[in-house]
């Protein structure tokens, strides 16, 4: 999801109300073999297996949870997810900046003057440490990604700004930028390499390469996923793309086209990619709400053909949440090849007030939450 300026402002205001005295940092989750789970999340045919249970799973997204500075807020969210029956939480494992932030501001990596500096301090990756630790305690599984295509929280453009280039697309082919990117990946993966909380490592949030030949992203995906598997062969790896570029059941509309440099079927065929991802935003793509059901089934068919499950990783609308998104959930649950769905995005009442709302947010305890979470989890249980 590309965040609006208004949403970023809301997030900034929420974090600005928090004391700059950060809580005492928790140590990074143990990476010793004794701390490792007996089994990591995996695929099983066209389904996922979590903690020994194979089936369909529901989850959500929270880009902001790793930037919170109050541990109690993190625990509140994790507790609500667990009690709701949600199993997977996708979080942003990046927070890139191009200048030194003010004291008390959370940031993960600084790109400046041709070099990158990773922040492992109390206002850096130690905040993500607590998210991982809390997820372990609450039996929540995390998808952690490493960079954003969009400029929100730095993105690929932060690398381009520091190392030179004409745009985000240079990120994929620059040896210098890829070296810095892989250094960051290595730091994060090794930090949580045996945590029971990690569901999958994700290359990026919504990677695109407009007007590029599809080989550009294919080569980057293949190289990066193999690099990650070399660091952690036991974990699943996914792309984090929107599912663009698909011939199966195509109606010729923009998302099915290859103009963003993506070929869903070809990329899914890479042996170091464990499952496919797709996002769903008809309002942004110039399609109808009903169109979304066909988008889901088309990807299910592609994943079935590949022998790998699909994850409906993001989906949202700004109105009529229950009727529109509820229909998509039913389609996903009944479609062979789709193994889980994560709505965008989760909302809660934090110590500083409500978490950020981009119009898609589904807040805990609301009527929308009842239909899209409580009822959906019940439907999964009875399927």
Swiss-Prot record:
Residues 1-21 form the signal peptide. It catalyses: Random hydrolysis of (1->4)-beta-D-mannosidic linkages in mannans, galactomannans and glucomannans. Glycans are attached at residues 17, 194, 263. One of its GO terms (biological process) is mannan catabolic process. It comes from the Eukaryota. GO terms for molecular function: mannan endo-1,4-beta-mannosidase activity. Substrate binds at residues 92, 205, 281, 344. It is an enzyme of class 3 (hydrolase). Coiled coil: none annotated. Its main location: secreted. Disulfide bonds: none annotated. Its EC number is 3.2.1.78. It is found in: Secreted. It holds the Pfam family Cellulase. The active site is at 206 (proton donor), 314 (nucleophile). Keywords: Carbohydrate metabolism, Glycoprotein, Glycosidase, Hydrolase, Secreted, Signal. GO terms for cellular component: extracellular region. Belongs to the glycosyl hydrolase 5 (cellulase A) family. Endo-1,4-mannanase, a crucial enzyme for depolymerization of seed galactomannans and wood galactoglucomannans. This is Probable mannan endo-1,4-beta-mannosidase A. It comes from Aspergillus niger (strain ATCC MYA-4892 / CBS 513.88 / FGSC A1513).
């Amino acid at each position: 999801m590309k965040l609006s300026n208004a949403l970023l402002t809301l997030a900034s205001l929420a974090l600005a109300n928090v004391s700059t005295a950060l809580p005492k940092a928790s140590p990074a989750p143990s990476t010793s073999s004794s701390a490792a789970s007996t089994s990591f999340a995996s695929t099983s045919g066209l389904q996922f297996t979590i903690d020994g249970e194979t089936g369909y799973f529901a989850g959500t997204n929270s880009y902001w949870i790793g930037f919170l500075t109050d541990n109690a807020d993190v625990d509140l969210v994790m507790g609500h997810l667990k009690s709701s029956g949600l199993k997977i939480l996708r979080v942003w494992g990046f927070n890139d900046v191009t200048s030194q932030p003010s004291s008390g501001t959370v940031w993960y990596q600084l790109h400046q003057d041709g070099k990158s500096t990773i922040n492992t301090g109390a206002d850096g990756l130690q905040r993500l440490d607590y998210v991982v630790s809390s997820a372990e305690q609450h039996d929540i599984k995390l998808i952690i990604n490493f960079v954003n295509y969009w400029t929100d929280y730095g993105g690929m453009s932060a690398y381009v700004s520091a190392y030179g280039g004409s745009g985000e697309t240079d990120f994929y082919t620059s040896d210098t930028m890829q070296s810095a990117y892989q250094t960051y990946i290595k730091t994060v993966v090794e930090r949580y390499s045996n945590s029971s909380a990690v569901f999958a490592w994700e290359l990026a949030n919504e990677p695109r390469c407009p007007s590029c030949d599809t080989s550009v992203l294919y080569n980057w995906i293949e190289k990066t996923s193999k690099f990650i598997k070399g660091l952690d062969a036991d974990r699943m790896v996914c792309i984090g793309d929107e599912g663009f570029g698909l011939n199966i059941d195509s109606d010729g509309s923009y998302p099915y086209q290859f103009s963003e440099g993506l070929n869903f079927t070809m990329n899914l065929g890479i042996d170091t990619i464990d499952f496919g991802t797709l996002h769903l935003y008809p309002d942004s793509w110039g399609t109808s709400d009903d169109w979304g059901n066909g988008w889901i089934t088309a990807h299910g068919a592609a994943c079935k053909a590949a022998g790998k499950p699909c994850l409906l990783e993001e989906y949202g609308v700004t109105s009529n949440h229950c009727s529109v998104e509820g229909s998509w959930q039913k389609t996903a649950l009944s479609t062979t090849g789709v193994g889980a769905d994560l709505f965008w995005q989760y909302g809660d009442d934090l110590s500083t007030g409500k978490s950020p709302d981009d119009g898609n947010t589904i807040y805990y305890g609301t009527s929308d939450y009842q239909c899209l979470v409580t009822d959906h989890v019940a439907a999964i249980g009875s399927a």
